[in-house]
């Protein structure tokens, strides 16, 4: 018997509601990729024996200070299985190497240096609590040298190297692991770069699939986490750069400034939710394109970015929800690298931003937001003076 039109409408409605429920439920659980991801932090002792050998011939320093405190961030790790993982790491000293009293003159010049690595990490479980960990892979060494009166005493350098290491891990539980670790990157005679050794202690936090009861609670909470949002924004230096400077300097240095400054700009942003908790936290990815005009000379340039986004919806009321957001290290393209005579690096850079906003309306279909932003390459290249984006006001809608 042919299906009646009313029955067809009912079937279609049930299907749509079921599909929407599945979609909402799927965002309350970590994806397969995220459930194998982890993040980490190590602090410890770094050594690279900088000496007068790094200086240009004819120059000597009476005092070379090599601070040894350093940190290493595991920006992203991925567990293939219990025997093998891969990591992206970023390591830098807390304070820079300094050359003082050069050729009898009272100079105090810093050498900026950091190491980014992509490594494979084999692991050998010893028992349920301890494991031996290895490390081997690719390293990118970046050094910004020193100069006096446009005379380079230590050249800038960016080159590929290797990174090897190993350590012991103690598994507190299925999410937390404590680590003791050592790593090594060899010297490069051509670049006059000494070897780098790092000895550290730290932790690793692993994401895991959530229990079914937690997923059910998160997905059926009744709080709205918009699936997608599209925004258009306008940036202006008319209010000044006070907000940028406040959050990039003491007493609250939680963001970055920049030597090149933007006068105005227009942005287009797309964001998509991929995970949310019951009420407050959500994780999203986004994409943006933007047009900018510099503050000093009115130079035009463009950017395009992909980025992760952390959102914290801290206040929920009947008419609006209020949130704070923070995004860091979004891979980006920038069309111009010298802006108002400021050398910002290469055309590959990173986007960072922080802000606050609201979702409004019965189904939270309307969005308004303001934020500050920043572009820099994270010292992947010797020139890294950064671009400061002033307050940006955005309007958008969700769907």
Where are the language model's segments positioned?
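Short glycine/proline- and aromatic-enriched beta-strand/turn motifs that initiate or cap beta-hairpins
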Residues: 23-78, 196-271, 396-398
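Residue-level signature of outer-membrane beta-barrel architecture
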Residues: 45, 78, 122-124, 168-170, ...
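Transmembrane beta-strands of outer-membrane beta-barrel proteins
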Residues: 37-41, 84-88, 116, 132-136, ...
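Gram-negative (and chloroplast) outer-membrane scaffold detector with strong preference
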Residues: 47, 75-147, 262-334
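Hydrophobic, lipid-facing positions within transmembrane beta-strands of outer-membrane proteins
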Residues: 37, 70-74, 114-118, 138, ...
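Repeated loop/turn-to-beta-strand initiation elements of outer-membrane beta-barrel proteins
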Residues: 83-86, 128-132, 170-180, 209-214, ...
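Outer-membrane beta-barrel translocator domains and adjoining extracellular loop/strand segments
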Residues: 51-58, 98-104, 144-152, 190-197, ...
């Amino acid at each position: 018997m042919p299906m009646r039109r009313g029955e067809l409408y009912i079937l279609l409605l049930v299907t749509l509601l079921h599909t929407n429920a599945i979609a909402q439920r799927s965002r309350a659980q970590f994806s397969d990729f995220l459930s194998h991801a982890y993040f980490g932090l190590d602090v410890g002792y770094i050594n690279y024996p900088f000496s007068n050998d790094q200086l240009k011939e004819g120059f000597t320093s009476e005092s070379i200070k090599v601070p040894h405190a350093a940190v290493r961030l595991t920006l992203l790790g991925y567990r293939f299985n219990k025997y093998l993982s891969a990591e992206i790491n970023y390591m830098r000293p807390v304070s820079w190497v300094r050359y003082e009293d050069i050729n009898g003159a009272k100079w105090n010049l810093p050498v900026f240096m950091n190491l980014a690595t992509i490594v494979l990490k084999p692991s050998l479980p010893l028992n349920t609590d301890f494991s031996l960990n290895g490390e081997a892979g690719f390293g990118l060494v970046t050094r910004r040298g020193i100069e006096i009166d446009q005379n380079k005493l230590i050249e800038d350098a960016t080159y590929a190297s290797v990174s090897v290491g190993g350590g012991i891990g103690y598994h507190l539980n299925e999410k937390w692991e404590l680590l003791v670790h050592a790593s090594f990157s060899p010297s490069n005679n051509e670049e006059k770069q000494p070897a780098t050794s790092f000895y550290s202690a730290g932790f690793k936090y692993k994401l895991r699939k959530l229990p079914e009861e937690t997923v059910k609670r998160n997905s059926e909470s009744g709080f709205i986490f918009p699936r997608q949002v599209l925004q258009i924004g306008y940036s202006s230096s008319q209010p000044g750069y006070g907000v940028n400077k406040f959050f990039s300097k003491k007493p609250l240095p939680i963001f970055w400034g920049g030597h090149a400054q933007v006068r105005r700009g227009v942005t287009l942003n797309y964001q998509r939710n991929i995970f949310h908790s019951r009420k407050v936290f959500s994780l999203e990815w986004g994409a943006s394109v933007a047009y900018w005009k510099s503050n000093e000379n009115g130079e035009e340039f463009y950017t395009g970015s992909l980025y992760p986004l952390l959102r914290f919806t801290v206040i929920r009321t009947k008419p609006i929800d209020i949130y704070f957001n923070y995004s860091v290290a979004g891979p980006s393209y920038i069309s111009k690298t010298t802006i108002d005579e400021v050398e910002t690096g290469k055309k590959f850079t990173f986007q960072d931003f922080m802000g606050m906003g609201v979702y409004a309306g019965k189904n939270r279909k309307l969005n308004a937001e303001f934020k500050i932003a920043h572009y820099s390459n994270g010292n992947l290249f010797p020139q890294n003076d950064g671009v400061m984006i002033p307050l940006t006001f955005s309007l958008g809608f969700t769907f």
